[in-house]
Swiss-Prot record:
GO terms for molecular function: alanine-tRNA ligase activity; aminoacyl-tRNA deacylase activity; ATP binding; tRNA binding; zinc ion binding. This is Alanine--tRNA ligase. It comes from Ehrlichia ruminantium (strain Gardel). It is found in: Cytoplasm. Binds 1 zinc ion per subunit. It comes from the Bacteria. It catalyses: tRNA(Ala) + L-alanine + ATP = L-alanyl-tRNA(Ala) + AMP + diphosphate. Its EC number is 6.1.1.7. Coiled coil: none annotated. Keywords: Aminoacyl-tRNA synthetase, ATP-binding, Cytoplasm, Ligase, Metal-binding, Nucleotide-binding, Protein biosynthesis, RNA-binding, tRNA-binding, Zinc. One of its GO terms (cellular component) is cytosol. CDD domains: AlaRS_core.
Length: 887
């Protein structure tokens, strides 16, 4: 029986109970699913066992128990809009579950569930009710036998709520649920009644009896291996055990909400605090898995969660960032909301979580300040039941960047309806306007209208550049200077050319485009040998998803529509691009294998001279880690792995472990998979045939480009060799300048640094003597000593150091000096005086006499003014000090 009812206690009790009953424990799988494009996030306990249920995963696992972190913020299961407005909805929650893969079925599953709720949780059986699917007489009889319940306590449900399926086809089966009765003081009716949506009867456990297979014709057949899938919401059962019927009243949420109220200084608006508490938890777990706020896919979901919470922070009239101040409750061992014991990733990623929450909330606050007053103004004219114009919603979105979902949140709270048609009409018009704009942007000012007309007359270009560096092709169309169609292009002309077939790779997937030559080989049906009609291809672009545009400069002769040309790419440049692209895949693989499996690609650039790879990670790579990456890369290069590509549908690719950066854009189309050893990625780029062709690899920089995002730049092949030679050249130049053999350079530099430091100390001492000789005035004001003086020829950094060296706790020091036609004041204030005056306060004090600027802290400040004459500054300061210390 449970002795404590904290969330962590309940989680441990559940897991221990099923482990004692022969189940294998599985830690929670990530929220971000690596091998299932059908789901944005893990949303149920069974997700990590999906391949076992369907027998795709051949591991011999008979039973399992887990506490699975889940997120429901999109698609069929989207609880985002309900969070804060109901007692039970969360974006992030934990699902306790026990599973059987052919080991046991209904009777033992029911037996285990009953024993847990009655013997371990010690729930009052009088408060429990059971539901079964109306056709599942077997489950009805088993519950009656095991629980000794009367027929009226076991309710048959006819709706599909009690029949679960994995999809339209595949494994499925009836469900049975355990409900808890909170009593007559809470509104609501039994399951299956019109009042069932009330809070009185709460489902605490769902048992799925997976015994059928549904065909595409809808027919059911008995599965040869029957399975059990159960789910118990940890937050819900915690509410039951803690005697509350509101999940937000459990210890975990109470701790988060208490911190929200404390930090914001606002205890009103309970809904706001609930939303903030829920969303902080969700965002923290997503960031811990490597997500950063963005504008697409999962990154956008994270941004949406943080921004929704930020809007509620704004409602509290709290002007600072709040979420990052609440998060530490989740990693504080003394807190009732402590989760880092079971989820250590929260502790590991704490700095990144705090930084991202703070930055994203700060950035969005500007949007809130600009857009919300405009929305509020529009809403003053509307009442519940009215419709907010789609034009207004679109203007807020398009002009101010105010998210539509937040607008809908706000109007929903007030009972105002959404002008869906008006909004989407505006969106469609904007898409039409931006289509050409996007085309122009993507083609660097190509005339969109001209190419739209051309597209009507020609099929997509046939790309053959994976296997061919040179092909013969026919010129179909030419556009001169981006504004007119031409039939002939002459020497010096800049022209964009469309051909029927091309070996030129157009920029895509981060890889730069091919360059090369076009040479006319046939004109008007006649072969031209040794043709002098040549064009340089300087860039290649793919527009309209299949029309390849070659940007050219006519080098000699002319090109005419209808010419047959030899289209030849710059093979040396292509090979460098291939080496860098394959190295990028291997770098991604190594980072995940050797540094952190949660690392995700955030962007890349594959050039011929270097590669750039952006990835999610919350700290700088150490020198040791960089060496590990380089060594592992060199191993893979030396092993000379073949690089293989194959075409398959997306699901097959994902089932085989391929990484897709943005699975949503692929839908169910065929995809190209690039396999390099154990690295598998969806990719349309060009690659080496064997890893040995990469030659060598060197990381030349590693840096931060945004909160939680790092960037690696590296070189391969000849460029890596050139880099080594340049570094070697610099080393020899340094050795020559310090007059040392190369092998002793560090020793010699260390010696020079020591000598330099000794000379610097002597110089400082000399300057200190100069200050003493130039005279220091000492005056007693109250109980303090005020030292001041006017200096010349002493650097300001020396003055600061002098003050910090001589300053004592009951002393104020002020020196001035003229530097570059400005008088500089440096002020020091002893520690014991900070309660009455700080060094930074002297910025205002001096500014009362002469116009000045500056800054500092409690102990030291620096102020600058264009007025070289000291005027009455010292006297004014003394007067101020008298009023401060004699008051």
């Amino acid at each position: 029986m449970i002795k404590h009812n904290l969330v962590s206690d309940l989680r441990r009790l559940f897991i221990d109970f099923f482990v004692k009953n022969g189940h294998q424990f599985f830690p929670s799988s990530p929220l971000i699913i690596k091998d299932d494009p059908s789901l944005l996030f893990t949303n149920a306990g069974m997700v990590q066992f999906k391949q076992i249920f369907t027998s795709v995963d051949g591991r011999s696992i008979n039973t399992a128990v887990s506490s699975q972190k889940c997120l429901r913020v999109g698609g069929k299961h989207n609880d985002l809009e309900n969070v804060g407005h109901t007692n039970r909805h969360h974006t992030f929650f934990e699902m306790l579950g026990n599973f059987s893969f052919g080991s046991y079925f209904k009777e033992h599953a029911i037996e285990l569930a009953w024993n847990f709720v009655i013997k371990e949780l010690a729930l009052d059986r009088k408060r429990l009710y059971i539901t079964v699917y109306h056709d599942d007489q077997d489950a009805f009889n088993l519950w009656k036998k095991i629980s000794s319940f009367s027929d009226d306590k076991i309710i048959k449900i006819k709706t599909n709520d009690n029949f679960w399926s994995m999809g339209n086809v595949g494994p499925c089966g009836p469900c049975s649920e355990i409900f808890y009765d909170y009593g007559e003081s809470v509104k609501g009716g039994l399951p299956g009644t019109p009042e069932e949506d009330g809070a009185r009867f709460t489902e605490i456990w769902n048992l799925v009896f997976m015994e059928y297979n549904r065909t595409k014709e809808g027919e059911l057949s008995v599965l040869p291996r029957k399975c059990i899938d159960t789910g118990m919401g940890l937050e819900r059962i915690a509410a039951v055990m803690q005697g509350v019927h509101d999940n937000y009243d459990i210890n975990l949420f109470k701790a988060l909400i208490a911190m929200s109220k404390k930090e914001s200084g606002n205890s009103s608006c309970e809904i706001a605090h609930r939303v903030i508490a829920d969303h902080v938890r969700s965002a923290a777990f997503l960031i811990a898995e490597g997500l950063t706020p963005g504008n697409e896919g999962r990154d956008y979901i994270l941004r949406r969660i943080i921004r929704r919470a930020a809007r509620y922070v704004y409602m509290l009239k709290y002007t600072d960032s709040l979420m990052y101040k609440i998060f530490p409750v989740l990693i504080d061992e003394t807190s009732n909301a402590y989760m880092a014991d079971y989820y250590p990733e929260l502790l590991k990623a704490k700095d990144m979580i705090i930084s991202i929450l703070k930055t994203e909330e700060e950035n969005f606050k500007d949007t809130l300040v600009r857009a919300l007053p405009l929305l509020e103004k529009e809403l003053t004219y509307l009442s519940a039941g009215d419709v907010l114009s789609g034009d207004v919603i679109f203007r807020l979105y398009d002009t101010y960047g105010f998210p539509v979902d937040i607008t809908l949140d706000i109007i929903k709270e007030r009972g105002i309806r959404f002008d869906e048609k008006g909004f989407y009409d505006n969106m469609e018009q904007q898409k039409t306007r931006s289509r050409l704009s996007h085309l122009i942007k993507s083609t660097e000012q190509l005339n969109g209208k001209i190419w739209e007309d051309i597209r009507q007359n020609y099929n997509n270009t046939r790309f053959v550049g994976y296997d061919n560096f040179q092909v013969q092709s026919k010129i179909l169309s030419m556009v001169m200077n981006n504004d007119r169609n031409v039939t002939v292009a002459n020497v010096g002309d800049k022209v964009s050319i469309l051909m029927d077939v091309t070996p030129f790779y157009a920029e895509a997937g981060g890889q730069q485009a091919d360059t090369g030559l076009l040479s006319v080989v046939r004109r008007d049906g006649k072969d031209l040998f040794g043709s002098s009609n040549i064009a340089d291809v300087t860039n290649t672009k793919n527009i309209f998803d299949g029309l390849y545009i070659h940007e050219c400069i006519i080098k000699s002769g002319s090109l005419i529509i209808g010419d047959i040309v030899s289209a030849e790419i710059n093979s040396h440049r292509r090979k460098d691009l291939c080496a860098n692209h394959s190295a990028t895949h291997l770098l991604h693989y190594i980072l995940r294998m050797e540094i952190d499996n949660n690392i995700m690609q955030k962007g890349s650039l594959v050039g011929n001279d270097k590669l750039r790879f952006d990835f999610s990670y919350n700290m700088a790579l150490t020198e040791k880690q960089i060496k590990l990456i380089e060594n592992r890369m060199c191993d893979l290069i030396r092993q000379n792995h073949p690089v293989e590509t194959n075409i398959c549908n997306l699901q097959d690719a994902m089932d085989n472990g391929a990484i897709a950066l943005f699975t949503e854009k692929y839908d169910n189309h065929e995809v190209r998979v690039v396999n390099i050893g154990n690295s598998k990625e969806l990719c349309c780029g060009t690659h080496v045939k064997y890893t040995g062709e990469i030659g060598c690899f060197k990381i030349i920089s590693e840096s931060s480009i945004a909160c939680g995002i790092r960037r690696i730049e590296a070189v391969t092949g000849q460029y890596a060799i050139d880099y080594f030679r340049q570094q070697e050249k610099v080393l020899y130049q340094v050795a020559e300048s310090v007059k040392s053999p190369v092998e002793d350079v560090l020793v010699q530099i260390d010696k020079i640094n020591r000598e330099n430091q000794e000379l610097k100390q002597k110089l400082w001492a000399a300057y200190f003597d100069i200050i003493d000789m130039q005279g220091v005035n000492i005056e007693k004001i109250g109980n303090i000593n005020f030292l001041h003086g006017t200096l010349s020829g002493v650097p300001i950094d020396v003055v600061r150091k002098f003050i910090m060296k001589r300053l004592v706790k009951d002393m104020i020091m002020l020196f001035s000096n003229v530097v570059n036609h400005n008088r500089i004041y440096v002020v020091g204030v002893g520690n014991s005086l900070h309660s009455k005056v700080k060094a930074a306060d002297f910025v205002k004090i001096i500014n009362c006499v002469v116009k000045s600027k500056g800054g500092g802290n409690a102990q030291l400040a620096q102020i600058s003014t264009e007025y070289i004459a000291e005027v009455n500054v010292i006297q004014h300061i003394k007067d101020e000090l008298v009023s401060i210390f004699n008051a």
